[in-house]
Structures are given as C-alpha cells and as structure tokens.
C-alpha cells in the first residue's frame, strides 16, 4: 500500500512539473557570436565603477576571449588558461520573478582572474627592454612544466595556486587603495565619545555630559530637577521655623542625617541660600518616595507619605522613576530603585561641592556600604580615604576614619567598564 502511494506521488510530481520542463528554452550559440562571460573573484574585488572591455582578436575563437578592466593603479584581467582539449560547458539560467527557470543561455567561463599593478608593469617593461628577458625561477619553471605535461588535476591545482598567490610588492602598491576602503567602511563607526555617551544612557543615572570640561557642567541641576518643578518647591514655612523640631516635621522624610545636618547649618546663616534649601527639600522628597515606593499605585496614599507636595512634583516622580507593567499597573522596579538612589547621590554631591561621605548616605538610604560605593562609581565618582586634615576637621578618630570614605566627583569622569563574560575554553 505504501509503495502504491509513493508511486502515485512520483507520478503527481512529474505531472505537476511537466509544464515547467516544456516552458524552458535552450538557446543555441553559433561560433561567431559571443556568449555571456562568467568568472570567479577571490581576495581583492575591483571597485564597483570599474568598466571592463572585451579583448578578442579577430582570428581567435571565443575560447581565447578575455575581459580587461582598469583603475588608476590596478589592471584586472579575466581569461581562460585551461590547456584541456575538451572543456566543460557552462550556462546561465534566466528565471522569472517566481524563480521559475524560463531560459538556459550558454556561457563562457573564464577560470582565472588576475590583478596587475600598472606601475610594476611599466617597471617590468623597462627592465626587459634594458636587460632582456629573464628566465623565471625554479618554481615558475616547474609550474610551466606542470601545465604542459601534467595531469588535469595537477594543472587545475597549479592554476588555482597561481590565481590566489599573493605577492609582497603587489600588496605594497595596493595598500593605499585598501586603506581607503577601510576608511570608508569605518566612517560610520561610533567614536569613543559616542560609545561613552551611549553607555551613560544605559546607566541608571541622571543625564550626564561625559565630555564636560568643568565639574559643574557634568550634571546640570535643571536636568535632574526640571525648572518647573524646582520653582514649585515651597520652602518658606521651613525657613520660618529655625527650631529643628518644627522644620523637620515639614520635610517629606524626617530621618535623614545628611538632610538634617545641612538644613540646620543652612538656617544658622543670616542670609539663607534658597537654591540649596530647595535642593535639600527635593533630596528629602526622593528619600520619602524611595521608602514609599510600594504605595505608588495609590496616589492619595502616596501624597500623604510624601507630606503633601505640589502635584507637579508627584507627577515628575512617577514619570521618571516608575514603569507600567503588562497589566497596566504602575510600579518601581529594582532598576528604578537604583535610579532614585543615583539621583539622590548626585544632588548630595552638588550640595557638598562634589565630595561627600559614603557611610552617612549608605545609612540614610538603608543600603550596604558596598552597594553605596558601587552606585557612587556608577555616577562617575572615585572612592577615596580622608586625609589627616579632613579627618580632624570632621572630628573622626583614626578607628572611625577607617570606616568612612568619601566619594569625589572629578573631571574627567570615570565610569565602571562594562563587565565581560569569562572566556570559554
């Protein structure tokens, strides 16, 4: 039963393709007409705009036809070097848009494709004219003997070896053309600055100018806190309450040692720096948002936990530090958590003139010191020990100073290099 089905399938296949076989036309070729010429190219390709011309003497057959093309420096020649009395026949298939073959056209295959440096050709002509023809090397003589008396297999191997042979002087003369091609191919490649900028975009950090020439230009305040939001921060009630017990209650997050120390210091000055006060308030808002992130789906609850800030500030937090899940809910992912912390770190660096204590902020943000060091490096900082003068100014003893490091932002910024996987054996 299976054999009958198989035979039936074969008959159906032959019947379905019988029409195709009848539709194929084989075009005859007379001795006088020239067929399409086909060759194979390996190695250095001629430029696309190279024009080739047919070279064929009137008293020669189509077998001896060749193609020659030239650029300013190189001559390309495709020809037939076969010594066989009987040659293989080649043809080209002409297909329609569906891929169905409609015509078969006889073609001529040129089995060698050579490149010659025009400058070397002129030099060879000059030497031959001056010294006469010089006999070839032993290898060339052996190759000539092989072509004359060798088997078809050896003749084919000799011709392939000759076609693919690379000469040192040839490479020396075409190097300019190769370099030009490489330059064109690499024009679209990104520069080191482009790569650094792209890597910065992949990091959970505020917008950064990796090529900044001054530390103030590395992180612009308006890129971290938009101007509309910055101007919406209302700090007058805070400034009117010099008592810490009063103004601390007005902050979105009350338990930050960093904020409380600097706000107290700020209020002790006769003329308060309102810009710095607004930055401290926004740092406190980010800290409150960080610890209230699980309430981000309920705006009313979130507003209460953030101490009722202006709506534009809540909108900005949700826009920059949340993402929408597949079911339409809003959440703060682990990457967004790192992003919030990085924004806080950069703002703290701005407040502390780009050098701040790592341990203080690690405790404020409830992260391990190692994690804080990692995120400081992510924003471009260097982790450094305190100098003896700095230690004494901070009132730290030598034992405590071992646990305290400072994160310093310097130009040029230094970012961690991308991690690479281990090489496989």
UniProtKB/Swiss-Prot annotation:
Q: Which family does it belong to?
A: Belongs to the eukaryotic RPA49/POLR1E RNA polymerase subunit family.
Identify this protein by name: DNA-directed RNA polymerase I subunit rpa49
Q: Where is the composition biased (Basic and acidic residues)?
A: 15-24
What keyword terms does UniProt attach to this protein? DNA-directed RNA polymerase, Nucleus, Transcription
Task: Specify whether Nucleus is a keyword of the entry.
Answer: yes
**Single GO molecular function:** DNA binding
Cellular component aspect of the GO annotation: nucleolus; nucleus; RNA polymerase I complex
InterPro entries in alphabetical order: RNA_pol-assoc_fac_A49-like
Q: What is its main location?
A: nucleus
| Origin species | Schizosaccharomyces pombe (strain 972 / ATCC 24843)
- Describe the function of this protein: DNA-dependent RNA polymerase catalyzes the transcription of DNA into RNA using the four ribonucleoside triphosphates as substrates. Component of RNA polymerase I which synthesizes ribosomal RNA precursors.
Which residues lie within the region annotated Disordered? Answer: 1-26
- Tell me the GO BP annotations in alphabetical order: RNA polymerase I preinitiation complex assembly; transcription elongation by RNA polymerase I
Identify the coding gene. Answer: rpa49
